Amino acid sequence: MKCEMTMKPTRRTILAGALAPLAARLAAQSPARPIERWDRFELQLAGPAEGNPFLDVRFSAEFRQQHRSVQVDGFYDGGGAYKVRFAPDAEGEWSYVTRSNRRELDGQTGAFLSSAPSARNRGPVSVRNTYDFGYADGTPYFPFGTTCYAWTHQPAARQQQTIETLRQAPFNKMRMCVFPKWYTYNQDEPPVYPFPRSAQDQNDYTRFVPEFFHNLETRIAQLQSLGIEADLILFHPYDHWGYALMPPEVDDRYLRYVVARLAAFRNVWWSVANEWDLVKGKKTADWDRYFRILQESDPYGRLRSIHHSGPMYDPTKPWVTHVSIQGDDFAKIPEWRAAFRKPLIFDECKYEGNIPKRWGDISAREMTRRFWLGMANGAYMGHGETYLDAHDILWWSKGGVLHGESPRRIAFLRGIIESGPAEGAAPVTGAYYPCIARAGEHYLYFLDFHQPALADFDLPGGRFTAEIIDPWAMTITPAEGTFSGKFQLKMPGKEMLAVRFRKT
């Protein structure tokens, strides 16, 4: 006869049984590995798919570490999936609790560990020392950007080709549109639209298409892996689908959705518009509102700018972090630095190319000259390329491959700038030739079109070595001896040279 014994439940076993589902849920909601500081933690929960979750469901989370609390908006990703992304800015344990107007999404709790960043993770870029930029870990960041407006709206193979081109290119910032673009050399339908679109070309602005944003996120992550900042253009006038003419409430909802999805990527910058003054139907008050939405919705304070065609949007407004400039009036750099007291980036100083447009037909030599002249006056520069192509595959719009000769020269300049003072260099007021310097330590002059056989210089006390730099030939030639005070330096007598002095 078999005898079975039944154990009487204890308080401990009852409590363990009650907590088991909670423990399992927390384990499922916590990452298996720590999240690096400044990287992305992502929580995904299952929720309602019926109705219109984009409008009907509110979802967010509060992240806590000791006395700190950070509120982060979540978003609906389709298929009943709700996500919230968070980029921890401190190491250690973080806890969270979700908030929602739907019971199944509300009050979900969990925790994760933030670990030390890896060697390639320097954190997000922000303004430092008024006119410059730096990574969160203290490393200086000198922007050397390029433009590919519609590269993420191309066939997948071309998008990947663009990534492979960038892998070998000198650029560490990419200007790119969120919305597709319709303009000369770029009149193609995108593979996916940001909003559902009917056969009659009507947009359903009450919903988003998650697949559109999945692709964008993949490309932003690839840029991050290459050390490239993604300068995302949120609005532009070159429209074919109605995105430049959306009602105000749709504009606002779009901005909040984009911030919820993308702000946790540490390499994201916000460019509120490309050529803001050409976007018809929007007033200055609208652009002010967009900036305020970014400020209020973005818990990380990513960099914010706005690009112009003619008149600038007022760069002194507090929500503008740096000045995005179209043009080549480098003589105004000292005036703008004094007036705006913010970093200046000539994101568009015209493009290397040969198209029948004045903005897209400068030579590689002239692009190289503009990079040197702008930087020697205290600004940062941006590249673009517009060479005619039988299939209209121009880098400036669609990406693909680079054909020009300026990128190699830009790489050469970037190496010179990044090997300079870690604290950066400032323009020297009243210098005979444009010059940026770390006073008493390091001087970089650009002689532009001047071609002296003997060049006059005036350095402070101490001794300095001199090097003659040819930006086009990409050579650095040491001069014999050391120099101090007022003197003449023997030069090759050719234009577009630079001279670097470093204290011995």
Summary of predicted features, one role per range:
Residues 353-355, 367-478, 492-503:
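Aromatic- and carboxylate-lined catalytic core of secreted/periplasmic carbohydrate-active enzymes
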Residues 67-73, 473-480:
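Surface-exposed loop/edge segments in extracytoplasmic proteins
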Residues 29-67, 72-75, 113-116, 434-435:
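Non-catalytic, glycine-rich low-complexity segments
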Residues 122-332:
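Active-site mouth of glycoside hydrolases
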Residues 3-21:
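N-terminal secretory signal peptides and thylakoid transit peptides that target proteins
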